[in-house]
Regions:
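Helix-loop-beta substructure at the N-terminus of cytosolic sensory domains
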Residues: 2, 14-73, 84, 92, ...
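Allosteric cytosolic regulatory segments
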Residues: 3-9, 24, 161-172
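Signal-transducing alpha-helical linker
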Residues: 14, 18-22, 31, 35, ...
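Regulatory sensory and allosteric helical modules in signal-transduction proteins
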Residues: 71-73, 79-117, 121-124, 129
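Short hydrophobic beta-strand micro-motif common in sensory/regulatory domains
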Residues: 130-137
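Short beta-strand-to-loop transition segments that serve as allosteric relay/switch motifs
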Residues: 144-155, 169
Length: 256
């Protein structure tokens, strides 16, 4: 007799836990994703099939929380979407509890469990009877929780929870890498925006210095006064000055 529970369509637990194919598949999807959200949408069904196998009645969601960034959530169906947990919605549900405690949380039967009444009532309304939440920590770069819900009660016995956590751990490094790459991408965009803004302001200051025969400090003060009187950002006023002078918008050139 197999000592570990299984269900139709689910690969052998030990095969899943020992296979490096999950990491390779996640990396492939990361390489072909322009945005972090695109990657998570592609990663979610892959993680679901590798962890729980191919069968009906499974819905999954992934919630990513990062410092100073809005929560990012993806889901595989309406029931999972309805159960999304964010700090402002269901802040005390099984997913948030898993993140807070740093360990998996499971609900055997949403109709009889009394831990999260509001959240589980929504689950019951959508025909969901079992829940499993698996947390992942990315240090100071964020944390995420992968949640599964099914239409059958008691669908996640302890051995399945343990094997699911082990398989998810295989892909954790790629998920962390995706979060880190997105942070660098946002930083690059912010730097480009800042440099573009600086270019427009510097050009406008130079034009004002030439026209008014003033020094840099005086020209910038004039630019700020115009910004204040017109209730516009300094950059917008600077762009208008440059366009009026050169008949072209200012541009910043970046080396590839």
């Amino acid at each position: 007799m197999d000592p570990l529970p299984s269900f139709p369509g689910r690969p052998a637990i030990f095969d899943l836990a020992s296979s490096p194919a999950l990491t390779d598949a996640l990396i492939e999807k990361l390489l072909h994703s322009e945005r972090l959200e695109d990657f998570l949408h592609q990663a979610l069904p892959l993680l679901t099939s590798r962890i729980l196998g191919e069968r009906d009645g499974i819905h999954a969601s992934l919630l990513l929380l990062r410092p100073r960034r809005p929560a990012l959530a993806v889901s595989s169906g309406d029931p999972a979407k309805a159960l999304h947990e964010t700090p402002g919605r269901f802040p005390g549900g099984p997913g948030m509890t898993a993140l807070r405690e740093g360990s998996p949380v499971r609900v055997g039967d949403t109709r009889t469990d009394r831990r999260w009444p509001a959240h589980l009532a929504v689950a019951v309304d959508h025909g969901i009877h079992s829940l499993l939440a698996l947390p992942l920590e990315f240090g100071d770069e964020g944390q995420c929780v992968l949640s599964f819900c099914t239409t059958r009660p008691r669908d996640f016995p302890p051995a399945v929870v343990d094997s699911a956590a082990a398989v998810l751990d295989r892909g954790a490094s790629v998920l962390h890498l995706a979060v880190r790459l997105d942070r660098y991408r946002v930083l690059e965009q912010d730097l480009r925006t800042a440099m573009s803004t600086r270019t427009a302001i510097d050009l406008a200051v130079g034009i004002l210095m030439a026209q008014d025969r003033s020094d840099q400090t005086g020209a910038f003060a004039l630019l700020k006064r115009a910004s204040h009187y017109r209730n516009l950002p300094v950059r917008d006023v600077a762009v208008e000055i440059v366009e009026r002078f050169s008949q072209r918008s200012p541009s910043t050139h970046f080396d590839a």
